[in-house]
From Swiss-Prot:
It comes from the Eukaryota. Residues 415-424 have a biased composition (Acidic residues). It comes from Macaca fascicularis (Crab-eating macaque). This is Dynein axonemal assembly factor 8. Residues 125-139 have a biased composition (Basic and acidic residues). GO terms for molecular function: dynein complex binding. Residues 166-175, 435-444 have a biased composition (Polar residues). Residues 112-215, 228-267, 344-380, 395-444, 461-535 are annotated as: Disordered. The modification Phosphoserine is found at residues 175, 362. One of its GO terms (cellular component) is cytoplasm. The lineage of its organism: Eukaryota, Metazoa, Chordata, Craniata, Vertebrata. Keywords: Cytoplasm, Phosphoprotein. One of its GO terms (biological process) is outer dynein arm assembly. InterPro entries: DNAAF8. It is found in: Dynein axonemal particle; Cytoplasm.
Length: 535
């Protein structure tokens, strides 16, 4: 390197040196204050012009091994070149016949003198190791930034010794071949008692102590807890101590476990048992809690049973309600089309209820004309929802209307013709007070209106003709002209007035007169039924 430096440095007699004279003086004055590019070689012995970072040879870029090779006289020569080992997978055998050393390099840097062919590898390593044996037979050769372990192996009891870690060594049982032979069985063991390795393996001793403490903690705190929880359900019925059987099971499992298995076997076995026992343990613990809390368990069972019964009742009730609605619709249509001889049987359900209420109130003396419209209006408010049975949009269950239906039918069978006339008179007063505007304001669909008109027309055709002396408006029209005319002429006049009023009552509803032959008492009775508009 000195020759290269001298060749690269300019000579003093050259014209280049004369031109750089002032710059050299400036450099000398400022050099002490400028930081060096290479801190280790800032004050170099080679001269001012040497910059070791740029003038270094390519072979010098290998990590500096001067500290490791300073004590070795054979390796003290700095002109020795280094090369990487040709075989990285196989360890290098470098030792004598008594103690053979193995160097595992990944990747290792060994001198070129030692990197020879595999055929005469053992002889060359023996010669080199014999020269180094007097110096330090147990010291390994290390490289900066890489870990290389020399593993000593004797003929009788060979061992692999780790230099840096110093805690692990692999014992080879009864095999004279190399340790990487598949027939050689390696087992984990500790290397202790080497006084030279004690200062270097101080960290390994601490690690070993930490591992032992951790293993003890796992065995005491975790394994015993797992086995105790697993054995708890089995011994809960007996009521004895739970920990004793668990420890017995744990000791038995350890005794049955072969010696070749690692010490981490018990946790795996206990975890496998825990997976099998988890569900049973949860069920038994819940059963024990329910027994301790008293009647909570049966209560929950009863609640679940009641809930099932409620569900069983509510699910068919919806179907039953729908079937009742369909059956009611069918009966209403059959009643409208069939020939009925009594008014309460022909009227729908809400009109039956209204008629029954009006009949009950009309039985009292002096209440023939006054309470009729009021009761009709009250019933109209109570039975307001339109098209309940036609569109099957029922807001109130039909069970509430069944008593009224039965009461209406009983009254219809037991009432006399005089009560029928009183009901017709009360309905006539209500029909006269009602206006077409009030009927049009009610919320009903077009379909419901058409069905109402069709039902009213069919009922008007099916109703029989009543006698002349029992006309619908006879007694009511008789009151205003009571003092003006005689008996026979007055009856005939009342018949004509009743016919005119029935015709006027049919016209505002938009029903054509051609559908009916002539204004008959039956048609007048049909017009006197306000609840028909509410269906």
């Amino acid at each position: 390197m000195a020759s290269n430096d001298e060749g690269m440095a300019p000579s003093l007699g050259s014209p280049w040196a004369s031109q750089t004279g002032p710059w050299d003086a400036i450099l000398k004055a400022v050099k002490d204050q400028l930081p060096s590019l290479d801190s280790d070689s800032s004050l170099s012995d080679y001269g001012e012009e040497e910059l070791s970072i740029f003038q270094r040879n390519q072979t010098a870029l290998i990590p500096d091994l001067s500290e490791e090779l300073a004590e070795d006289p054979a390796d003290g020569d700095k002109s020795r070149t280094w090369a990487a080992a040709a075989e990285e997978s196989l360890p290098e055998v470098c030792g004598t016949q008594k103690s053979v050393r193995l160097c595992v390099c990944n990747p290792a840097l060994v001198p070129a003198e030692l990197a020879t062919e595999p055929g005469n590898r053992r002889n060359t390593r023996t010669k080199d190791a014999s020269s180094q044996e007097g110096r330090d037979p147990g010291r390994p050769v290390e490289t900066s930034g890489e870990v290389s372990a020399f593993l000593g192996m004797a003929e009788e009891t060979p061992r692999w010794l780790g230099s840096d870690l110093g805690s692990l060594s692999f014992n080879t049982k009864g095999s004279q071949g190399p340790p990487w032979d598949p027939q050689a069985k390696a087992s984990l063991s500790r290397h202790e008692g080497d006084p030279k390795a004690e200062p270097a393996s101080q960290e390994s001793v601490n690690r070993r102590a930490l591992r032992q403490e951790r293993r003890k903690m796992i065995e005491k705190d975790i394994l015993q807890k797992v086995t105790r929880d697993a054995c708890g359900p089995a011994s809960s019925d007996q009521g004895g101590v739970k920990e004793a059987p668990c420890h017995a099971v744990e000791s038995a499992a350890r005794s049955k476990m072969p010696l070749a298995e690692p010490p981490e076997g018990p946790p795996v076995l206990s975890l496998q048992q825990l997976e099998a026992w988890d569900l049973d343990y949860i069920l038994q613990s819940l059963a024990g809690q329910e027994d301790n809390q008293g009647n909570r368990g049966p209560g929950t069972v009863w609640w679940a049973a009641d809930r099932r019964q409620v569900q069983d009742r509510t699910v068919p009730s919806a179907d039953d309600r729908l079937m009742e609605q369909l059956a009611l619709l069918c009966t209403m249509q059959s009643r409208a089309s069939a020939c009925a001889w009594k008014v309460p049987a022909d009227t729908p359900q809400d009109t039956e209820e209204a008629g029954a209420g009006s009949r009950c109130s009309s039985r009292k003396p002096g209440s023939e004309a006054g309470p009729g419209p009021q009761l009709a209006q009250g019933m109209r408010l109570n039975t307001e929802p339109p098209t309940i049975f036609i569109d099957l949009r029922q807001t109130v269950p039909p069970d509430h209307l069944s008593p009224a239906r039965s009461r209406g039918s009983s009254h219809s069978s037991s009432d006399s013709e005089e009560e029928e006339e009183e009901v017709e008179m009360a309905a006539l007063g209500d029909a006269e007070g009602a206006s077409p505007s009030s009927l049009g304001l009610r919320s009903c669909t077009g379909k419901s209106q058409l069905l109402q008109q069709l039902r009213a027309f069919r009922k008007g055709i099916a109703q029989p003709k009543l006698p002349a002396n029992k006309g619908p408006g006879g007694e009511r029209a008789q009151a205003p002209e009571d003092t003006a005319a005689s008996g026979t002429v007055r009856k005939q006049h009342m018949k004509l007035c009743a016919k005119g009023q029935s015709a006027q009552a049919r016209l505002p509803r938009g029903r054509p007169r051609a559908l009916g032959d002539a204004p008959e008492p039956g048609a007048a009775r049909e017009a006197l039924m306000p609840p028909l508009d509410q269906l």
